Regions:
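Hydrophobic alpha-helical membrane-insertion segments
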Residues: 13-23, 81-105, 210-228
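Hydrophobic core of alpha-helical transmembrane segments in multi-pass integral membrane proteins
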Residues: 14-25, 52-58, 86-90, 257-277
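Juxtamembrane helix-loop-helix connectors linking adjacent transmembrane helices
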Residues: 38, 71-150
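Transmembrane alpha-helical segments in integral membrane proteins
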Residues: 51-64, 139-167, 266-279
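Membrane-interface helix/loop boundary segments of multi-pass membrane proteins
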Residues: 154-180, 207-214
Length: 287
């Protein structure tokens, strides 16, 4: 058996605790009659984020393997700024996909799955609304750490730094590795009505890792994406956009078509520039 396939089996075994947590949350029926207000929001945020530390367990399978070097320190400040810009433009470009994915209607023979998917989406949305309905600025800061920084680090560490790299070592095809790991990244969240936006987001993070050779850029992009979503919700909650403005926790802002088209053009220009910049930086450091 190929040694990298053996690594994949070991990685999968060590990932079982995480997989079981995700699957149990998906199949367990949430009692919506119990108000979330009886639980302390800060404790829920911290406990949920600490559970993500389990995502580092598969590192034991490859910790002595130089093929999995993630090059945390090999980054430049200017590139990080451009990654911020690229991620922001992606959020705008991704908004029509979010709207389309939420409106998907299944054929009759999949009606049971559709009912289940909508129920889970509704339950998770209620939970998310409670978690991000911060009572004060301190809770908002805890939310940034629990929802943006910790998931950004540990999810990228596993899905891009370990799984994507392993798929590449097996297939020797970067594109296959990026798309397959992004598929797993999106599927394991067990939220169909956010599957495709999360898939494309994972693909973006995968290419950032591939071009740069450093997992830091993917982590920064992931954390910024979550930070932006939490901050927009908090700002709307505080009335910074006006009292009449309402923003759904999983709904993108209603953007005019011209804004989306302009954002797409800027996104394509920026991603080309970022790709060249990261590839050049990687070549300089290797040379």
């Amino acid at each position: 058996m190929n040694k990298h396939v053996k690594e994949l089996l070991y990685i999968s075994l060590l990932s079982l605790p995480v997989i079981l947590i995700f699957l149990s949350s998906a199949v367990t029926e949430i009692d919506t009659e119990i108000p979330y207000e009886i639980f302390d929001r800060k404790i829920m945020l911290i406990s949920n984020s600490l559970a993500l530390v389990l995502l580092a367990l598969p590192y034991r399978a490859i910790r002595k393997n130089t093929n999995y070097n993630m090059n945390f320190k090999k980054v430049s400040l200017s590139s990080i700024v451009f990654v911020f810009i690229l991620t922001f433009l992606f959020v705008l470009v991704d908004s029509p996909i979010v709207i389309w994915n939420k409106s998907v209607v299944f054929p009759e023979f999949l009606s049971s799955f559709e009912t289940w998917a909508k129920l889970k989406e509704s339950q998770l949305e209620e939970l998310t609304i409670y978690l991000v309905s911060f009572d004060n600025f301190n809770e908002y800061l805890i939310g940034i750490i629990a929802i943006a920084i910790i998931p950004g680090f540990f999810e990228e560490f596993l899905f891009r730094g370990i799984i994507q790299k392993n798929f590449y070592l097996i297939s020797r095809n970067h594109h296959l590795a990026i798309w397959l790991s992004a598929f797993i990244f999106s599927a394991i969240h067990m939220q169909f009505y956010g599957f495709f936006p999360r898939l494309f987001m994972g693909v973006l993070f995968g290419y950032l890792f591939h071009w740069s050779g450093s997992i830091t850029y993917a982590m920064v992009a992931h954390a910024f994406n979550n930070f932006f979503a939490v901050t927009m919700w908090y700002a709307a909650q505080q009335g910074y956009f006006g009292k009449e403005y309402e923003l759904g926790v999983n709904d993108p802002p209603d953007l005019p078509v011209v804004v989306i088209i302009l954002s797409l053009i800027l996104f394509l220009i920026t991603i080309y520039f970022v790709r060249q910049k990261l590839l050049n930086e990687r070549a300089d450091k290797m040379g």
